[in-house]
Structure formats: structure tokens, C-alpha cells
């Protein structure tokens, strides 16, 4: 999860997030290289004493600075499109869990377990235990399995919300009257935090998401322990 004064991304807990971090690092390297070359060219132009007033055009140079940026953009776009299609793939999920956004809490429904439904509210500061995270703890966590594809069906009952867990690489809008879906496969057990990422009213900041990822064998025993 995030920590104070963090400059980088959170550690990946899904293959999609691993791909996103790799793509981010590669794009950042390309940006630094381009910025360095531009600054070097500008500084050289400003400091050089060599001038040539007879140059009218430079076809070779113009061709290079037209083709080279196009090649760089293509090299950035291809992995970006690959990750985009990865996030939209729905390949036979093992479990389906429905998440409904409200002002200002979440409702979860385990459709594969007899329609088990429960609400998840933020814990007020007075109810926090030592070591708990302010504005991030909830009374009922959503429990999810690792090493199995899970489909999240996300909607809203009132206004726009967004179900987001950064470490899983998930951010899906909850839209009233519309059922959005996303599939992920978690790779590590643990407790991971997120928040509603769409401004949804006065208490938007008090709408955390807490996912507890557990081994598949334990999850298959039944998610009743979430209550």
C-alpha cells in the first residue's frame, strides 16, 4: 500500500499492474532521454559561436525529425494498446462479485455463494484500533481469492462512483443504470486499500475500499467470515 512521502507506484499485486509499472518506467526513460537531448540541443545552439547564413533548407534533417518522433510514438503506443486490451479481457472467471456504490459506502454481493450481501462502511476514528489506518479502515472487508480470475461487476445506486484498488491496477467507474465489469488475478495474499476515485458528494473522501486477499482453498470454504 501507499506510505508517506512515497514517490513511486505501489507494489504490484496482479499481472496487469506489473505490466503498467513496466510500461510507466519505459515511458519515463524515453521522456528523460528526449528531454535531455532537447536541452542539450538548446544549450549548444545558445552557446555556439559558429553560424552559417547560407543554409536555406536541410531536407535530411527535416526528414529525420519527422520520422524519429513518429517511431517513438509508435513504440510507446504499441505496449499501451496491449495493456489496454489486457484490462478488457474476460476469460472464464472463477468467481463473480458485485459491488454497488452508494453515498457513501459500498455494498458487496457474492453471487456464487447464494447471494450473500453486506455493506462496507468506513470506520470512524473512535472505533480504530492501534495500527489501523485513518479514513481507510472499514467494518466489513471484501474477501477475494488469489491465483484465480475474479470478475467484479460494478454499478451505482445513486451518483457516479469509481471502484479503485491501485495495487491491483483496478479502476472501474460505477455508473447508475449501467453494469461495468473488470477481471483481475491477484498474486499475493494481504490486505489492500483503495478509495472511491470519482467525486460523489460531500463525503466522497470517506468511502474507502478494503480488499483482503486469501488463498483459494480458504476462500472456497465460504466467504461468510467477512461479516
Swiss-Prot record:
The keyword Protein transport does not apply. The chain crosses the membrane at residues 15-45, 60-87. One of its GO terms (cellular component) is respiratory chain complex IV. PROSITE patterns: COX2, COX2_CUA, COX2_TM. Its EC number is 7.1.1.9. The keyword Cell division does not apply. It is an enzyme of class 7 (translocase). Pfam families: COX2, COX2_TM. Its cofactor is Cu cation. Residues 46-59 are mitochondrial matrix. Keywords: Copper, Electron transport, Magnesium, Membrane, Metal-binding, Mitochondrion, Mitochondrion inner membrane, Respiratory chain, Translocase, Transmembrane, Transmembrane helix, Transport. It catalyses: 4 Fe(II)-[cytochrome c] + O2 + 8 H(+)(in) = 4 Fe(III)-[cytochrome c] + 2 H2O + 4 H(+)(out). GO terms for molecular function: copper ion binding; cytochrome-c oxidase activity. It is found in: Mitochondrion inner membrane. Coiled coil: none annotated. Cu cation A1 binds at residues 161, 196, 200, 207. GO terms for biological process: ATP synthesis coupled electron transport. Belongs to the cytochrome c oxidase subunit 2 family. Component of the cytochrome c oxidase, the last enzyme in the mitochondrial electron transport chain which drives oxidative phosphorylation. The respiratory chain contains 3 multisubunit complexes succinate dehydrogenase (complex II, CII), ubiquinol-cytochrome c oxidoreductase (cytochrome b-c1 complex, complex III, CIII) and cytochrome c oxidase (complex IV, CIV), that cooperate to transfer electrons derived from NADH and succinate to molecular oxygen, creating an electrochemical gradient over the inner membrane that drives transmembrane transport and the ATP synthase. This is Cytochrome c oxidase subunit 2. It comes from Papio anubis (Olive baboon).
Amino acid at each position: 500500500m501507499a506510505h508517506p512521502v512515497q514517490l513511486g507506484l505501489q507494489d504490484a499485486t496482479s499481472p496487469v499492474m506489473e505490466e503498467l509499472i513496466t510500461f510507466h518506467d519505459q515511458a519515463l526513460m524515453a521522456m528523460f532521454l528526449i528531454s535531455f537531448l532537447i536541452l542539450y540541443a538548446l544549450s549548444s545552439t545558445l552557446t555556439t559561436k559558429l553560424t552559417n547564413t547560407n543554409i536555406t533548407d536541410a531536407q535530411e534533417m527535416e526528414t529525420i525529425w519527422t520520422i524519429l518522433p513518429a517511431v517513438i510514438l509508435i513504440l510507446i503506443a504499441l505496449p499501451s494498446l496491449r495493456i489496454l486490451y489486457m484490462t478488457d479481457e474476460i476469460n472464464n472467471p472463477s468467481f463473480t462479485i458485485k459491488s454497488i456504490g452508494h453515498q457513501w459506502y459500498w455494498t458487496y454481493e457474492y453471487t456464487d455463494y447464494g447471494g450473500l450481501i453486506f455493506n462496507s462502511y468506513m470506520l470512524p476514528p473512535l472505533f480504530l484500533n492501534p495500527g489501523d489506518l485513518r479514513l481507510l479502515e472499514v467494518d466489513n472487508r471484501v474477501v477475494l481469492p488469489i491465483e484465480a480470475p475474479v470478475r467484479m461487476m460494478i454499478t451505482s445506486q445513486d451518483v457516479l462512483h469509481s471502484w479503485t484498488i491501485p495495487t491491483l491496477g483496478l479502476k472501474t467507474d460505477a455508473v447508475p443504470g449501467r453494469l461495468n465489469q473488470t477481471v483481475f488475478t491477484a498474486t499475493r495474499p494481504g490486505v489492500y486499500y483503495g478509495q472511491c476515485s470519482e467525486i460523489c458528494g460531500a463525503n466522497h473522501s470517506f468511502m474507502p475500499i478494503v480488499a483482503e486477499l486469501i488463498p483459494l482453498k480458504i476462500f472456497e470454504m465460504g466467504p461468510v467470515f467477512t461479516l
